[in-house]
C-alpha cells in the first residue's frame, strides 16, 4: 500500500493538504492480504473519530464516483483547504460530515459539530477500509521503500 507519511488527516480540520499521487509515496506498507483493495495509507490525528487512535494509520480506497458514497460509512475527504475523516451522509449538492465523538460543551453543544462539505469543493474521497494502531512492540514494522 502506498504510504504518505507527510500527508495526514485529523478528526477536525487539517490545513496540510498534500499530494497523494500514487507515483510519489513516502514509503510502502506490506499489509499482506489485510487490505487488498487499498490505494493509499495515511496517518490520522485527533479525537473526533473515536474508532481511530491519534497517530494510527488508515488504509484507504479512492472513490472515483461520488454517487457511490455509502451513507454512514467513514471517509477521508480532501478539498483544496483541508482533509478530514468523517462519517458522510449525502444531502443533495453537499455531504454532511459527522464525527463519532459525541462529546459536548457545558452548554450542550457538540464539540465536534457536524458540518457541510459542498460536493463541487471535493478533490478526492477515500473510503476508510481499516486502521492499524501500534500500541507497543519491540519488533520491527514491515515497511518497504
Predicted segments with their positions:
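Short, positionally conserved secondary-structure boundary motifs
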Residues: 1-54, 63-67, 121, 131-145
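Short, compositionally biased
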Residues: 49, 70-83, 91-93
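Structural motif
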Residues: 53-57, 73
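Residue-level recognition of conserved beta-strand edge/terminus positions
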Residues: 60-62, 78
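Short, mixed charged/polar active-site loops
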Residues: 83-85, 112
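Amphipathic alpha-helical interface segments
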Residues: 96, 101-145
Amino acid at each position: 500500500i502506498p504510504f504518505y507519511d507527510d500527508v495526514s488527516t485529523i478528526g477536525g480540520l487539517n490545513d496540510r493538504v498534500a499530494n497523494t499521487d500514487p507515483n510519489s509515496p513516502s514509503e510502502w506498507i506490506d499489509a499482506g492480504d489485510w487490505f487488498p483493495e487499498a490505494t493509499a495509507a495515511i496517518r490520522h490525528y485527533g479525537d473526533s473519530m473515536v474508532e481511530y487512535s491519534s497517530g494510527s494509520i488508515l488504509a484507504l480506497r479512492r472513490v472515483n464516483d461520488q454517487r457511490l458514497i455509502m451513507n454512514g460509512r467513514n471517509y477521508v475527504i480532501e478539498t483544496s483547504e483541508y482533509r478530514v475523516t468523517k462519517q458522510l451522509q449525502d444531502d443533495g449538492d453537499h455531504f454532511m460530515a459527522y464525527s463519532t465523538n459525541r462529546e459536548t460543551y457545558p452548554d450542550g453543544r457538540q464539540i465536534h459539530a457536524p458540518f457541510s462539505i459542498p460536493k463541487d469543493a471535493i478533490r478526492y474521497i477515500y473510503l476508510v477500509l481499516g486502521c492499524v494502531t501500534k500500541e507497543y512492540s519491540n519488533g520491527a514494522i514491515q515497511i518497504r521503500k
